[in-house]
Amino acid sequence: KVFAIDILDMEKIDGVNFFQISIEKIEEIEEIDLLKGKFNLVISDIAPNLTGITAVDCANVLDLNHLTISTAHKFLEKGGALIMKTFQNNNLKSLRKNMELSFKLVQTYKPAASKKQSGEIYIYGVK
């Protein structure tokens, strides 16, 4: 099964169960909550609305990343993987160290499709 959650509406995709809800409330969805520890992959491209104030934006990104890691840790099976969007900033090193506490393999990568000047990167972790 494929589940998608987002605070914004999403176009229907065959085979995808979509829930318009914040990640903070994912455990309120019984169909998903019953599958704790059974997901083999969690993909997150969550990003906050950017303010242009670096300190605020970095803190907001970090908060969402920690929420994503916590959620993935609850729902992933052993050997399951997390792919999470984040941004290159002063918090990246500590974020990666935090992930290394819960995941046996952690790697960062920048997709070829991402613009060179963009700070967007992805962190991959295997539980």
Where are these regions (language model features)?
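Short catalytic-loop micro-motif centered on adjacent basic/acidic residues
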Residues: 81-85
